[in-house]
Amino acid sequence: MAISSIFLLSLFSLIYVIPIEATHHVYQTLETLSSHHSSKSNHQPYRTAYHFQPLKNWINDPNGPMRYGGFYHLFYQYNPKGAVWGNIVWAHSVSKDLVNWTPLDHAIHPSQPSDIKGCWSGSATILPGGKPAILYTGIDPNNHQVQNIAIPKNMSDPLLREWKKSPKNPLMEPTIANKINSSSFRDPTTSWLGKDGFWRVLIGSKIDTKGMAILYKSKNFVDWVEAKHPLHSAEGTGMWECPDFYPVLDKNLLRTGVDTSRNGDDDVRHVLKVSLDDTKHDHYLIGSYDVVKDVFVPENGFEDNGFVLRYDYGKYYASKTFFDDGKNRRILLGWVNESSSVADDVKKGWSGIHTIPREIWLHESGKQLVQWPVKEIENLRMNPVNWPTKVIKGGERISITGVDSVQADVEISFEISDLGKVESLRKWIDPQLLCSQKGAGVKGGVGPFGLLVFASQGLKEYTAVFFRIFKYQDKNLVLMCSDQSRSSLNKDNDMTSYGTFVDVDPLHEKLSLRTLIDHSVVESFGGEGRACVTARVYPTLAIHDKAMLKLTSEY
């Protein structure tokens, strides 16, 4: 196999089984966002440098992202008093580019009976005339989950620094009449305006083990009435947290996004995403929105399989999208929890980050969504490094030098010329289990091949991101894994391996891998964004300049 160009965005192609050619280009490092993000301190080897992360304390769900007044606004669940969950407020940051963020004062904090015990997740909607409104879940004195509204105090302030709550709060609440579970009624979506002039919003809920998205309607965005039936529900899925419902363009080669209120057109399909509380993963369905019956109808293949597809097959939850009307794209943000122990989080003084914002759109096949880091992240790239073409044989590991191995953006493409030695899968198996059984140290017919990230001298520690190819029912099946089983000598960490199958035919197209590396997070995008896997890792040896980045090909 041969390498031809590493960019950091490390680009290289590999032809497998026999020696192959490849190219790779590398940017030597990704610029650290600002001094308060810097993780160069020996005492903070795991603080990220270019991911969204507060200076200290606990962060979880992204809330109410929107573009207003020339700024991107991001609100988020935050504990101002510590590095564990509790005392939740809506913190607020703004950005011009979705990469460099400036923190502002907290936007929403407990102050009314309807939210006195917490201001939980919700969404922002831009009303006619360009006025933002936030619907969010509050916890009342009885620990009931209710829905509230807040609007800006000063519409002329592009930073939206102050918000006021309605005296009519709560606008939606569980009652004896509606029989809604008061402990399972949260996370309102971005609202959409129907052609009948009514606003609609979804609230996540459940009845026993049936998860559902309860639908409410309003003419004035204040007086809401529950619809006769949920927009959608599914038995055995448990509580639906952080639902998201939005249109996507069919056959969208330009990756264009559309406004949330776009519906009923022939070129539009809809996505229903839910964060399943039982599994702590974000799943989605693709289907159509029946605007007459007010129901979501999953397409063939999604009905029987249920919530099989996921945004990200690693550590990723409570995501939220918004339509960026400035660039006609839909942006996805998600929360990445720690894999360290609570005791270690308290010692660090912080917990949780957000992924790099991703563009999201419908793949041309119509069978799944595609995600890719926003273009703006490329402005952080520095110092390109170019490698001449190299031949790599099976069993070789090549160090990628001249780069900052703990803070990088790597792109690779693999080209396979011979699949005669692929392993056979006799029966279907869960890909995450398969990644655990056949990790980076287990040789196969074709694979594993990919990257070793945060690798220590002697490989006592490393995180592996790799592909492996199988034959299943006379078709080639590509497995993508993020193997954390040897990521740290600290056994208190969660070192679960993750993975998924990638819908790529390796005979007719290259296998691409892009990996964003940032001190304790590894975001990987396979098949040009058709599969995403995020990992949190905390090596004890492979930190700072002791960490190595390697290309590996074991077969």
From Swiss-Prot:
Listed GO MF terms: beta-fructofuranosidase activity
Record-listed substrate binding positions: W58, I59, N60, D61, Q77, W85, W120, S121, R186, D187, E241, D277
Key words of the record: Disulfide bond, Glycoprotein, Glycosidase, Hydrolase, Signal
Catalyzed reactions per annotation: Hydrolysis of terminal non-reducing beta-D-fructofuranoside residues in beta-D-fructofuranosides
Glycosylation sites: N154, N181, N337
Similarity annotation: Belongs to the glycosyl hydrolase 32 family.
Name listed for the protein in its UniProt record: Beta-fructofuranosidase, cell wall isozyme
Gene transcribed to yield this protein: BFRUCT1
